[in-house]
Amino acid sequence: AVWMVQAWWSNPTNDLLKGMGEYRQDHVMILDLTGLEAPKWNSTAYGDTVLESAEFNGTDWVWCMLENYGGNPSMDGQLAKIAHDIPAAYQEAQHMKGIGIISEATYDNPVIYDLIFDMAWTEETQDIDGWLDDYVLRRYGAYSMSAREAWDLLEQTVYHRSGNTAQVMAALPENVGRTSLPYNPQLLERAFELLLEDFDLLSASEAYRYDLTEIMRQMVNNYAVRQYNNVIDAYEAGDLETFRIEKAKFLNAFDVCDLIQGTQQDQLAGEWIGKAEDWAIRYDDFAWDCLTMNAKALITTWAGAASASALPDYAYRNYQGMMIDLYKARWERLLDERERYLIDQDPIETWNQGNYFHFYWQWVMNTPEYTRKADNSPVHIYEVAQRLLSECSVIEELPENEGNLAMNKPIEASREVNSGGSGGGYAMYANDGTLDSYWDGGPWEERPWIIVNLGRSYDIGSVQVCAYASGSRYYQFEVYVSEDGEEWTLIGAKEDEAVETNEGTTFTISAPCMARYVRVIGTFSNQI
């Protein structure tokens, strides 16, 4: 027998490894659960544990990817990191015996699983561009240049990071404040539009229709995040009319999401519950009650009343049916309370986790009859897509940015320091066309940088950089351009101590300058 030991938190400890004996390779295998995000195999210290040597004191181990905590719906993953880190571990390690997937749930982000399974057959770093060329053709059964361009944008946004994307729809309403997204949602919407361009060519593919649904689900989530920030703004301003408008738009997002989820059978509440019923039918009534109740409790209360405050909504889903009967209903309750407060200052009834437990439990014990039939037809998918683009678009036209080639283009940064607010920290705020948000790249000593990909080469006439302006702040930085992202030309530098203003610093280029990439490197800040 072989003991499979999970590397998690402070485990395995030094004493545990010693206790496994001198010939551990014969009967012990360590699963490095967070090999992608926080590997332990190449460290001698994690949690409270200090080891004698790396690779778990020279014990055989498996590189693992832990995804989809709680089965929560979110488009995320790190394609380039997977393609790099697994071969790098093979090259460096002496005791790596394979790769593994330790997801808490599946049915989302199929691309990351396709990639990691391909990595089992090579010890070389995968070229993501080439891999995506093959993937699009293999997945959709036909090649589309627009679809391939869409996947470039997906790789630069949702598949450039791990961890659930911020969401508000399935969150406990009382716990939600202003929320920010870790990438530019307009780029995701652009990817979706590109994917739709060859709909007639690709729509016979079930995988293509699934991908459209998954992107639509993420798009409506991103729209709801932005829209709820608008709700907060109106409420805090005491503007009743605007509050009602923004509230209606926010609540409509639940209807659109419910419609989207109804296109995939595995995204139906009726299918989730129905699978438990299918299993339970072979047993007695008590088993039926237990299995179906557990299926419903798992995705709502997670546990019984005694644990109501421990992990509420840990395994939340946004299944069709649940979106309206649970999530929209509880948001309507709170927003109606706030609307009444704006009208006549009626006290707001605040719910705690105990209130929400009982709200959920009523649903668990008296669940409506939900359908198990999804409409995944191309005609219906296209109709849903048009409604989404019509009612939940995040594309904004900002006239004052006419001629701004960099606005909302793909951007990468050396580092992102999230401020926790709705407009600070992430690189996407560096080129969103407004001075109300900003990018934070960390200490200037690290020479933080950002690179904007304009999509194609342009003859650039000038570059304007607006650093954060407040009080006596001033920054120094260098600006470079490149056609290929490899060879860079310095076009200007701010080296003085002039205090920053909202006009920023403009570098005018007199000679013809063709460039696709623009890079800004911070070299000094007078702020500690």
Where are these regions (language model features)?
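Disordered, acidic Ser/Thr/Pro-rich linker "stalks" and the adjacent N-terminal cap
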Residues: 397-457, 468-473, 493-502
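Catalytic-core regions of glycoside hydrolase
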Residues: 1-144, 155, 160, 173-176, ...
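Core-facing hydrophobic residues within beta-strands of well-ordered domains
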Residues: 96, 458-460, 474, 515
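Mature N-terminal, pre-catalytic/accessory segment of carbohydrate-active enzymes
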Residues: 209-408
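Trp- and acidic/polar-enriched beta-sheet ligand-binding modules for extracellular glycan
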Residues: 414, 442-448, 469-528
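C-terminal functional modules
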Residues: 165-203
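Short edge beta-strand/loop segments characteristic of extracellular beta-sandwich folds
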Residues: 464-466
